[in-house]
């Protein structure tokens, strides 16, 4: 299966029991900032934004004072899982980032998708990639 198929079939799919509800954007990005696959709507990010995200995984709390920036959009960092998941909120939407051994799985959402639904979709694929040694 191609990386693009993982994004299309496992991240940008309808959310379980909520037909028509799906993430706004999603991507799988290597720890080095290289894009493995992304939805057409995933924002163009700057290298320093990815560096900040990777630093927060290694030093939890790094982004809390300044916020998480992706594609020029600022998200307020909310409780995640230290070293494993970063969550951000902006208005009625937000972002979840799950770290695997080699990649970061991104999910961006807006209402009517809930933070919990975004977390579930991103975590499910991230956990699968971890099980596969990725």
From Swiss-Prot:
* PTM description: Phosphorylated by MAP kinases.
Q: Where is this motif: Involved in PIP2 interaction?
A: 84-100
What Gene3D superfamilies has UniProt attached to this entry? Dynein light chain 2a, cytoplasmic
Report a single Gene Ontology molecular function.
Answer: actin monomer binding
- Residues with PTM Phosphothreonine: 114
Name the predominant localization. cytoplasm
Q: Name one GO cellular component term.
A: cell cortex
Q: Where in the cell is it found?
A: Cytoplasm, Cytoskeleton
Keyword Transport assigned: no
**Residue ranges of coiled coil:** none
Task: Tell me which UniProt keywords the record has, alphabetically.
Answer: Actin-binding, Allergen, Cytoplasm, Cytoskeleton, Disulfide bond, Phosphoprotein
Q: Which Pfam families match?
A: Profilin (PF00235)
* Disulphide connectivity of cysteines: 13-118
What does it do?
Binds to actin and affects the structure of the cytoskeleton. At high concentrations, profilin prevents the polymerization of actin, whereas it enhances it at low concentrations.
Q: Describe the subunit structure.
A: Occurs in many kinds of cells as a complex with monomeric actin in a 1:1 ratio.
Similarity section: Belongs to the profilin family.
Please tell me what else the database record remarks about this protein: The variability of the residues taking part of IgE-binding epitopes might be responsible of the difference in cross-reactivity among olive pollen cultivars, and between distantly related pollen species, leading to a variable range of allergy reactions among atopic patients.
Q: What is this protein called?
A: Profilin-2
Instruction: Tell me the organism.
Output: Olea europaea (Common olive)
């Amino acid at each position: 299966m191609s990386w693009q198929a993982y994004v299309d079939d496992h991240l940008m799919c309808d959310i379980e029991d909520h037909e028509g509800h799906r993430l706004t954007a999603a991507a799988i990005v290597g720890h080095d900032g290289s894009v493995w696959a992304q939805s057409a709507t995933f924002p163009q990010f700057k290298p320093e934004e990815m560096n900040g995200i990777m630093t927060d995984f290694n030093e939890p709390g790094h982004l809390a004072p300044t916020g998480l920036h992706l594609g020029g959009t600022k998200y307020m960092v909310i409780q995640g899982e230290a070293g494993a998941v970063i969550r951000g909120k902006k208005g009625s939407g937000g972002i979840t980032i799950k770290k695997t051994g080699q990649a970061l799985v991104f999910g961006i959402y807006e209402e009517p998708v809930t933070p919990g639904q975004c977390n579930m979709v991103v975590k499910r694929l991230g956990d699968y990639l971890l099980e596969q040694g990725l």
